[in-house]
Curated annotation (Swiss-Prot):
Residues 1-92 form the CARD domain. The keyword Cytoplasm does not apply. Residues 93-115 are annotated as: Disordered. InterPro entries: CARD, Caspase-like_dom_sf, Caspase_cys_AS, Caspase_his_AS, DEATH-like_dom_sf, Pept_C14, Pept_C14_caspase, Pept_C14_p10. The gene is Casp12. SUPFAM superfamilies: Caspase-like (SSF52129), DEATH domain (SSF47986). Pfam families: CARD, Peptidase_C14. Keywords: Apoptosis, Hydrolase, Phosphoprotein, Protease, Thiol protease, Zymogen. GO terms for molecular function: cysteine-type endopeptidase activity; cysteine-type peptidase activity; endopeptidase activity; protease binding. Its EC number is 3.4.22.-. It comes from Rattus norvegicus. This is Caspase-12.
């Protein structure tokens, strides 16, 4: 039927032309603003071509049924240019957010936070129309190019007015922050993780931009990982540092991070307790009262972490342990301190469930984590950034996982203040 109509009178041809012109304009803007690179644009273009091709077949079907149905469908497509819009942040965004976080009154601050969340949601709603045409894998791994920096005035204001609520942050001059990345890519018995190089490079770049000197160790057994952690904990630079990051990327099971010799018959696993023990206040005094952030990209089981739920309400129960009896001893010659404080662990999935990666784009968790750090760490504290990452996984998709915040013993808020 399509062959009988000329291009000049063919509504399908007109719609395809309109859609192509509109998408070309959007893609040009995305390239100009460095939102997409050439490879990403090519992948999106392939997805858009597929959608246009499928849309042509669908519209043809409507025209064969009735002329009116075709007009209705064509009208909706023709009006799509009003929906396909991107809202970019204004130049005074930083000033607005600084006002929002200025500690005046609790009610005023809360109101401004709600306003900011509304603005962010509006921007997401507009952008989502374009994202509908992007393949799932590209959506999930798209990362903002540059780290947004914190102004000097904002840094000084927060350090002064919220000194009792936040962890002390040292001045850049003389500060010797260290971060450790352990990544296992080659395994004796498990599948290799060749695409993990993307995660290593992106995490290294992020941590360096945050002021950390990054140590990278690859392809270690559990015992070798423990040895490297002990060496890192003993580094003298921690004395003149205000925090540290420990990043683990490997295969994993519920009990911990897999070493390169792991197999079911003979496990090779670095347990969480081992990590926390090495860096606790007793064994790593240089990092006492300083934030110790653990990032773990690894599966924690083989389940997908999704279920089908009904609208009926269920009842949850939990068992409780008996009360622990504590004995207090006083000694005038020493100061009592908690064995484990100032830790937070952010893991890529819930217990028993898997973590996803998408080819050479790296893992979903690491890419979302880096994206949220680049967007929000100039103004949000660490736990709020982690919640932003969790929010990005809130709606289950084809690749489903839910990052979890665990073993939190931080007593204050930790701000990174990038650029300071």
């Amino acid at each position: 039927m399509a062959a009988k109509r000329t291009h000049e009178r063919d509504p399908i041809y007109k719609i395809k032309g309109l859609a192509k012109d509109m998408l070309d304009g959007v893609f040009d803007d995305l390239m100009d603003k460095n939102v997409l690179n050439g490879d990403e644009l090519l992948k999106i273009g392939e997805g858009a071509s597929l959608i246009l091709s499928k849309a042509e077949n669908l519209v043809e079907s409507f025209f064969e049924k009735t002329e009116m149905a075709g007009k209705i469908f064509a009208g909706h497509i023709a009006n799509s240019d009003k929906q396909l819009s991107l809202q970019f942040p204004s130049d005074d965004e930083e000033d607005e957010l600084q006002k929002m976080f200025t500690p005046s009154s609790a009610s005023e601050s809360r109101g401004k936070v709600e306003d900011e969340e509304m603005e962010v949601n509006v921007g997401v709603a507009h952008a989502s129309h374009l994202m509908l045409t992007v393949p799932q894998g590209i959506q999930s791994t798209e990362v903002q190019d540059s780290l947004k920096l914190c102004s000097r005035d904002w840094f000084c204001t927060m350090k002064t007015e919220r000194a009792e609520e936040i962890y002390p942050v040292m001045e850049k001059e003389g500060r010797t922050r260290l971060a450790l990345i352990i990544c296992n890519k080659k395994f004796d018995y498990l599948f290799d993780r060749d695409d993990a190089e993307t995660d290593i490079l992106n995490m290294k770049e992020l941590l360096q931009n945050l002021g950390y000197s990054v140590v990278i160790k690859e392809n270690l057994t559990a015992q070798e990982m423990e040895t490297e952690l002990m060496k890192f904990a003993g580094r003298p630079e921690h004395q003149s540092s205000d925090s540290t990051f420990l990043v683990f990327m490997s295969h994993g099971i519920l009990e911990g991070i897999c070493g390169v010799k792991h197999r079911n018959k003979k496990p090779d696993v670095l347990h969480d307790d081992t990590i926390f023990t090495i860096f606790n206040n007793s064994n790593c005094p240089s990092l006492r009262n300083k934030p110790k952030i653990l990032i773990m990209q690894a599966c924690r089981g083989r389940h997908t972490g999704t279920i089908w739920v009904s609208t009926s309400k269920g009842i949850a129960t939990a068992d409780t342990d008996e009360e622990c009896v504590l004995s207090h001893r006083w000694n005038n010659s020493i100061t009592k301190a908690h064995v484990e404080t100032d830790f937070i662990a952010f893991k890529s999935s819930t217990p028993h469930n898997i973590s996803w990666k998408v080819g050479k784009s790296g893992s979903l968790f690491i890419s979302k984590l880096i994206d949220c750090f680049k967007k929000y760490c100039w103004c949000y504290h660490l736990e709020e950034i982690f919640r932003k990452v969790q929010y990005s996984f809130e709606v289950p998709g084809e690749l489903t996982q839910m990052p979890t915040i665990e073993r939190v013993s931080m007593t204050r808020y930790f701000y990174l203040f990038p650029g300071n």
